[in-house]
Amino acid sequence: MIGNPVIQVPSSLMPSSSMIACPRVSPNGVPYLPPKPRTRHLVVRAASNSDAAHGQPSSDGGKNPLTVVLDVPRNIWRQTLKPLSDFGFGKRSIWEGGVGLFIVSGATLLALSWAWLRGFQMRSKFRKYQTVFELSHASGICTGTPVRIRGVTVGTIIRVNPSLKNIEAVAEIEDDKIIIPRNSLVEVNQSGLLMETMIDIMPRNPIPEPSVGPLHPECGKEGLIVCDRQTIKGVQGVSLDELVGIFTRIGREVEAIGVANTYSLAERAASVIEEARPLLKKIQAMAEDAQPLLSEFRDSGLLKEVECLTRSLTQASDDLRKVNSSIMTPENTELIQKSIYTLVYTLKNVESISSDILGFTGDEATRKNLKLLIKSLSRLL
């Protein structure tokens, strides 16, 4: 048999006791017909052995591998639902139970997360400590102002206590491992485009090495760091308000000086101009007198003579340069050096002879004898 013919058999043709139409009577005595029977179609497939043998491999071979992979969880789900359906758990009840389980698990996870966050906050709260900065001017310090150590934010201002004497800014440091040395420089600075106020802490040398933290009871005895709720003094750093005040004072002083001295300066300038007028007249007269002299000097041949003299000096310098180059040849230079060496040697000999003569004539007895000899010779002559 070729193919898989389908034979539809109406269920109405099948023998059934319900197919016998019997008139029925209602309780009030009115007869009525029985309900129309529902027709059911049964599908019967006929297949040969050969088709059954070859049909399965062909259907499996034509499936997409992705479809096969996606069918695996579906088949697992179906296999899981079968035993549950035997105990009265339908598909709807399973979905409702899954939704309820999801809601319960989500609520449990949310509660655990909230408990963990609260525990973390409580643990971090026990590790924080407070310090008080004593300042002469607030300079915009308010709740939330950052506190920095070497440019790193380590805490914030939680409260500001103003008074007529000073300002006390209470800061909360985030971790007790962050210490503030006693010798630190605390400044209130304003920086940035919006001139944000911040408290900068700059530790100075020598950097302390405490053995206990700021929350330890023995912290105050060491005196190396700022302990919990202790006070440290601060100074005013870069302040926009102070800069504006300085420029305002300078402007007022300049304005006062300018208004006071403008009139006196104008009077002095006028007096100087009046005193300079005779001098200007004299300069003008001298210029008029010098103009004829300049014209005569220009018309005379003095300029030409000066030019000739300059040319003569130039030629003389050229001649001297040539003579120098002709005389100071390497041979002449060597001869001059030898002559200088000979002269030096001769002078040394003369010096030795003169020293000998000086040593001979330097004796008193020799001088007397020479005088007597000269006198005797003069008598003989």
UniProtKB/Swiss-Prot annotation:
**Consequence the record notes for mutating residue 237 to R:** In tgd2-2; accumulation of trigalactosyldiacylglycerol
Q: What residues span the transit peptide?
A: 1-45
What is the top-level taxon of the source organism? Answer: Eukaryota
Q: How does it assemble?
A: Homomultimer. Substrate-binding subunit of the TGD complex, a lipid translocator at the inner chloroplast envelope membrane made of TGD1, TGD2 and TGD3. Interacts with TGD1 and TGD3 with an overall subunit stoichiometry of 2 TGD1, 2 TGD3 and 8 to 12 TGD2. Interacts with TGD5.
**Domain-level remarks:** Amino acids 201-225 are sufficient for specific binding of phosphatidic acid.
The UniProt entry, under PANTHER family, shows: PROTEIN TRIGALACTOSYLDIACYLGLYCEROL 2, CHLOROPLASTIC
Q: What is this protein called?
A: Protein TRIGALACTOSYLDIACYLGLYCEROL 2, chloroplastic
Q: Per the UniProt entry, what species is this protein from, by scientific name?
A: Arabidopsis thaliana
